[in-house]
């Protein structure tokens, strides 16, 4: 009896086992679509970035002009640039939803998968940061200066490290050139780590909304979830191209339409919106080293979540009403921190940012304690 070629060919068999014939829980919700959407975003960013790199010039005298040239003279260059710039924003929207789903449904039970995912998160933030420097506008230059200068807070090696990153004594041509190289390299590293992420996920099997063992109730990924993913892609493209075609500069800082000038400081230096929550936490600490530690800890604390798995009976917040309230409060805190990051450094925004920073980190302390309390209650 003949078997389908996808089950007999060595390469197709491996791909089929990872996608087409993958046994999946039968009760996935819409929140499980964001993983495939992230893969789609990564492909969009790599392809659009590849074509943009063919026309971009990584030199301080030409970078800003080359970006203007792409928008004005290159066939559909304006579309490529809009897709790439807004694609980054949509990438982070999907990423935050994906992480939020993992926290709500306790996907950190799969420790290797979760930790690789957090590494991908760090690498994605690094990719976005070095990419933001490339247009060489005012916010690009001053954002690079401020953020890279934070490394000088590291004891003993800080100053040397900053000069090593800059390639000199200030943000200049050497900095721009190496940032362009990093921005080209990192997405392929993210793609490789995504394969590792999927490898670990397929070793353990996926979580599900109830957090229960679903070995007795699995269905093949294709057609059931492939069609669901395609439906998600269609909705994504609909919203994405509304932004790309009608509001191409909606997520862009107006300061970045001014060429970089080391002699003129912008009124309010801020990163892109997807870094603002971490930037607000950084600003809330009056000490420079403390601010840098808090900035890194705001994301690195995700590594600590798998350490709490021994404290709970169930593997989903569906069974923990108090923790559901706490989780959605945490989401509100995240959004408020993003808003605070846009505000000038003055009262009452400084004080509000400090309160929100304390509440942000308090979630990671209170959540396991309330989980344990609820388990003991019933």
UniProtKB/Swiss-Prot annotation:
Signal peptide: none
Residues the record lists as binding heme b b566: 98, 197
Top-level taxon: Eukaryota
Residues annotated to bind a ubiquinone: 202
Gene Ontology MF annotations: metal ion binding; ubiquinol-cytochrome-c reductase activity
Pfam family, one: Cytochrom_B_C
Disulfide bonds listed in the record: none
InterPro entries reported in the protein's UniProt record: Cyt_b/b6_C (IPR005798), Cyt_b/b6_C_sf (IPR036150), Cyt_b/b6_N (IPR005797), Cytb/b6-like_sf (IPR027387), Cytochrome_b (IPR030689), Cytochrome_b_C_euk/bac (IPR048260), Cytochrome_b_N_euk/bac (IPR048259), Di-haem_cyt_TM (IPR016174)
CDD domains listed in its UniProt record: cytochrome_b_C, Cytochrome_b_N
Cofactor: heme b
Binding site for heme b b562: 84, 183
Residue ranges of the TM segments: 34-54, 78-100, 113-133, 179-199, 225-245, 289-306, 313-342, 350-369
Keywords for the protein's UniProt record, in alphabetical order: Electron transport, Heme, Iron, Membrane, Metal-binding, Mitochondrion, Mitochondrion inner membrane, Respiratory chain, Transmembrane, Transmembrane helix, Transport, Ubiquinone
Annotated localization: Mitochondrion inner membrane
Cofactor: how and how many bound: Binds 2 heme b groups non-covalently.
Gene Ontology CC terms, in alphabetical order: mitochondrial inner membrane; respiratory chain complex III
Bilayer topology annotation: Multi-pass membrane protein
GO biological process, any: mitochondrial electron transport, ubiquinol to cytochrome c
Function description: Component of the ubiquinol-cytochrome c reductase complex (complex III or cytochrome b-c1 complex) that is part of the mitochondrial respiratory chain. The b-c1 complex mediates electron transfer from ubiquinol to cytochrome c. Contributes to the generation of a proton gradient across the mitochondrial membrane that is then used for ATP synthesis.
Assembly mode: The main subunits of complex b-c1 are: cytochrome b, cytochrome c1 and the Rieske protein.
Family affiliation: Belongs to the cytochrome b family.
Record's protein name: Cytochrome b
């Amino acid at each position: 009896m003949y078997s389908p070629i996808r089950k007999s060919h060595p390469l197709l068999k491996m791909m089929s086992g990872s996608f087409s014939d993958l046994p999946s829980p039968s009760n996935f919700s819409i929140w499980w679509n964001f993983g495939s959407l992230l893969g789609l975003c990564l492909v969009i960013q790599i392809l659009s970035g590849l074509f943009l790199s063919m026309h971009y010039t990584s030199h301080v005298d030409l970078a800003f002009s080359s970006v203007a040239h792409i928008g004005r003279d290159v066939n559909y260059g304006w579309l490529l640039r809009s897709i790439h710039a807004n694609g980054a924003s949509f990438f982070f929207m999907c990423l935050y939803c994906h992480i939020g789903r993992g926290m709500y449904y306790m996907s950190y039970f799969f420790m290797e998968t979760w930790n690789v995912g957090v590494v991908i998160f760090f690498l994605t933030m690094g990719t976005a940061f070095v990419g933001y420097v490339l247009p060489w506008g005012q916010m690009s230059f001053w954002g690079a200066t401020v953020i890279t200068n934070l490394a000088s807070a590291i004891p003993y090696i800080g100053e040397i490290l900053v000069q090593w990153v800059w390639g000199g004594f200030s943000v200049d041509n050497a900095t721009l050139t190496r940032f362009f190289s990093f921005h080209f390299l990192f997405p392929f590293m993210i793609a490789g780590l995504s394969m590792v992420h999927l490898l670990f996920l397929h070793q353990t099997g996926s979580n599900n909304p109830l957090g229960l063992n679903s070995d007795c109730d699995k269905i093949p990924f294709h057609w059931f979830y492939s069609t669901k993913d395609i439906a998600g892609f269609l909705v994504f493209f609909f919203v994405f191209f509304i932004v790309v075609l009608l509001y191409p500069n909606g997520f862009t800082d107006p300061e970045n339409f001014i060429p970089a000038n080391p002699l003129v400081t912008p009124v309010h230096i801020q990163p892109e919106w997807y870094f603002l929550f971490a930037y607000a936490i950084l600003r809330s600490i009056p000490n420079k080293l403390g601010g840098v530690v808090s900035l890194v800890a705001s994301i690195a604390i995700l590594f600590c979540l798998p350490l709490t798995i021994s404290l709970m009976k169930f593997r989903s917040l569906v069974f923990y009403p108090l923790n559901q309230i706490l989780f959605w409060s945490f989401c509100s805190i995240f959004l408020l921190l993003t808003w605070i990051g846009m505000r000038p450094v003055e009262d009452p925004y400084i004080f509000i940012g400090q309160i929100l920073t304390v509440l942000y980190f308090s979630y990671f302390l209170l959540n396991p304690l309330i989980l344990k309390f609820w388990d003991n209650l019933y």
